[in-house]
Amino acid sequence: MKPGDFSARQEFSHQLVKAAVERTQHAVRYDPAYVRIPYPGGDVPADTGVCTDEVIRAYRAVGVDLQKEVYEDMKKNFSEYPRRAKRPDANIDHRRVANLMVFFSRKGETLAITERAEEYAPGDLVTWDLGGAVPHIGMVVDQKSLASGRYMIEHNIGRGPKIEDVLLSWKITGHYRYFGPASSASASRSDQQQAR
């Protein structure tokens, strides 16, 4: 997918949002436990997960393996990521909000952090500080709140996957768009050509 390919990006976002909305049909118990999982394509048990697992599972449904993408980028650029261990760990690194923030800023688009709800589009990823430096992540979906008129968020804050009007409920710390590895490879080539 070329960076300027608007229709391909629009279709990708549409499919990604559909996958995120579908996640609300699953019963998921909030469980942040460290679990050894296969690589690539590994996942914690389907009935467990945290906020990051909702993002991971939505992307996986459209053919993007964030476990692999994050791990591969961390292997090459470990110093760019927050340090929790001495080396990348494919079992857990993609399940950490701080790592996803770095990954999406490196491989996707970093967008303005604003309280203007109209700046957030379906498929956008939003991160928050829930207070006490507790991070959270969710995805903007194409359903609007009847009360506020804002696009709502698919996320798991401890009650399983839900769609709720929570965009402005906490301090926003990140706003991203990520269209998969083909998009970031194209963007990287474009950046290299512009640098010449």
Question: Residue locations for each model-derived region?
Answer:
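N-terminal capping segments
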Residues: M1-F104
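Generic detector of low-complexity/intrinsically disordered segments
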Residues: P3, T127, Q194-A195
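...with weaker cross-activation on analogous glycine-rich loops/strands in unrelated enzymes
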Residues: F12, V17, K75-E154
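Residue-level marker of positions within ordered structural domains that often coincide
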Residues: Q25, Y59-R60, Q143, G158, ...
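Residues in flexible loops and secondary-structure boundaries
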Residues: P38, G42, M74, F78, ...
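Generic alpha-helical propensity signal that fires on short helical segments
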Residues: P38, P82-R84, K144-L146, G158, ...
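A structural signal for short, hydrophobic beta-strand segments that form beta-sheets
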Residues: L66-Q67, V140, K171-G174
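Low-complexity, Gly/Ser/Thr/Pro-rich intrinsically disordered linker/tail segments
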Residues: S148-R196
